[in-house]
């Protein structure tokens, strides 16, 4: 979905090796995959993905199915892999900040998952100030 696409895009911009597991994806994921900037496994998350999960530094559970996200979180916790559950902040081991960039400066804005509106406003003001 849109959340996973945004996060995958940001991670690739910072040089991360990204794998997206999803039967369908938006234009940004498709374009990144075609450019070789991420790997796109075109299927729903399944047991065959456990091998890749075991090699992961971190995982983002951002499917449209809460039960699948919950299952991914459980699998990650069993393997001591930090995980972000896009639909449930209480199951997140880490959070994604709003990114404000004006090379060479990069600023991350986060409110601990408590006030996304505030984060958006602060990030917008920083972008305007840095322009």
Give, region by region, the residue ranges found by the protein language model.
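Adenine nucleotide-associated cytosolic modules
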Residues: 1-131
